[in-house]
Amino acid sequence: MEALAKHLYARSSAQKARLVADQVRGLPVEKALELLSYSPKKAAVLIKKVVDSAIANAEHNEGADIDELVITKICVDEGPTMKRIMPRAKGRADRIMKRSCHITVVVSDRG
């Protein structure tokens, strides 16, 4: 039994979100939620919401027991990048890259 949840166009770079995703991959969900709640990173809040959604999907759609769930797959892919211009001195301009990512979490039973 598997349940999936996605957050598309999350406003964090994929590189920063992968640091957090690598910490919770393969963990039981209760341990992962505890780790995410104490992490100071912005991506931890985004990933925690997706994990909560995946747990709710497993409970509602599959009737799964929450205590048995494990994060079997978590992947962070790059989303589109918004390019913005920042005016600088002497008529120059810098490009500001506002990156986004797609977070996918799959939870399933241990057995």
Curated annotation (Swiss-Prot):
- Keywords assigned by UniProt, alphabetized: Ribonucleoprotein, Ribosomal protein, RNA-binding, rRNA-binding
Could you give the subunit structure recorded for this chain? Part of the 50S ribosomal subunit.
The name on file for this protein is Large ribosomal subunit protein uL22
A Gene Ontology cellular-component term: cytosolic large ribosomal subunit
Pfam families tied to this protein: Ribosomal_L22
Annotated function: This protein binds specifically to 23S rRNA; its binding is stimulated by other ribosomal proteins, e.g. L4, L17, and L20. It is important during the early stages of 50S assembly. It makes multiple contacts with different domains of the 23S rRNA in the assembled 50S subunit and ribosome. The globular domain of the protein is located near the polypeptide exit tunnel on the outside of the subunit, while an extended beta-hairpin is found that lines the wall of the exit tunnel in the center of the 70S ribosome.
In terms of CDD domains, this protein maps to: Ribosomal_L22
Tell me the protein family, please.
Belongs to the universal ribosomal protein uL22 family.
Origin organism is: Psychromonas ingrahamii (strain DSM 17664 / CCUG 51855 / 37)
Determine the domain of life of the protein's source.
Answer: Bacteria
- InterPro entries for this protein: Ribosomal_uL22 (IPR001063), Ribosomal_uL22_bac/chlpt-type (IPR005727), Ribosomal_uL22_bac/org-type (IPR047867), Ribosomal_uL22_CS (IPR018260), Ribosomal_uL22_sf (IPR036394)
Q: Which GO terms are recorded in the biological process aspect for this UniProt protein?
A: translation
